[in-house]
Amino acid sequence: MSKLLTNTALSTFRSTRFAARQLSRNFGGIASTAQPVNLKAGYGLDYKKGLLQTQQRQIQLSGARNMFIQTQDTPNPESLKFLPGVEVLGKGNTHDFPSGTTAHGSPLAKLLFRVEGVRAVFFGADFITISKEEGAEWSLIKPEVFAVIMDFFASGLPILHESTPNADTEILEDDDETVMMIKELLDTRIRPTVQEDGGDIVFMGYENGIVKLKMQGSCSSCPSSIVTLKNGVQNMLQFYIPEVESVEQVFDAVDKMADSEFERFERNLKALKEKDSAAPAGGGTN
C-alpha cells in the first residue's frame, strides 16, 4: 500500500513539474515577442481633446522607463506644442528662443534648431513649443523633434545652462499700486491661459495708462495675437484696473531682425518665381 502511494505521489510530482515547465516556456515565448517601440515607426493614435488635436506616442527609453510625448495644436497653425510628460523648466518658468542665434544657453534648443524647418523654440513649465517656417511640413518635422526630445531627456543633460525664473512680474520696491496690480493679474489670470496655448506673455512696462507686453512662443507670430491682446488681455486688465487705457505689443531687436530676414527671403523668392514665369519656354522651332 505504501509503495502504491509513493508511486502515485511521484507520478503527481512529475506531472506538476512538466506542467510548470510548459507554462514557463509559454510565458517565455510571449515575453520574447515584446519589442521596443520604434520612435520612427508610425505616428500613434489621433484623438480629439476639446477643439485641439492631440497626438500621443509611446517612446521606449533605456531600461523599462517609458516617455509619453503628446502634441497639441495651438491657435497659431505654424506652431505646435510638444508635451513630453515630464517637467521642462518647472512651474512659473519659461524661456523663448526666437532664432537659432539665441540658443547658445540651451543644449536642447540647439538640437531642435538643427531640425530642418524649425524657426523658433519656446520652453514652458511642462511643454516645448516649436514654430516652423512657412511652407515646411509638420509630417517631416515632427518625427525629428520627437527623436531629439527623447534622446535629450534620456541623456540627463540640463535643459538650460543657467535656469532662472521669470522676473518680469516680480514686485519691486518702486512699483506703484497700479503696476503691482497689473503684475499680479498677469501672473494669476492671464499668463496661465496664454501658456496653455504654448506661449507666454511678458510684462515690459506701464506708462501713461498704456501696458506694454511682449508675446512669446506660439503667440509671438500668431495671426490672432493682436486680437488676443485687445479682446482678451486688455479687457481683463481694464475690468479690474480702471487706470489701464490700452495694451500695446512690444517687439525687441531679435523679433524685428527675424521679421526683416523673413520678409527679405519672401521678396527674393517672389522675384525668383516671377523671373521663372517670365522666361520663354524652350523647345520652340527657329
From Swiss-Prot:
[4Fe-4S] cluster binds at residues 219, 222. Residues 182-250 are annotated as: NifU. It holds the Pfam family Nfu_N. Its main location: mitochondrion. SUPFAM superfamilies: Fe-S cluster assembly (FSCA) domain-like, Hypothetical protein SAV1430. Disulfide bonds: none annotated. One of its GO terms (biological process) is iron-sulfur cluster assembly. It is found in: Mitochondrion. Keywords: Iron, Iron-sulfur, Metal-binding, Mitochondrion, Transit peptide. Residues 1-66 form a transit peptide. Transmembrane segments: none annotated. It comes from the Eukaryota. GO terms for molecular function: iron ion binding; iron-sulfur cluster binding. InterPro entries: FSCA_dom_sf, Nfu/NifU_N, Nfu/NifU_N_sf, NIF_FeS_clus_asmbl_NifU_C. GO terms for cellular component: mitochondrion. Molecular scaffold for [Fe-S] cluster assembly of mitochondrial iron-sulfur proteins. Belongs to the NifU family. This is NFU1 iron-sulfur cluster scaffold homolog, mitochondrial.
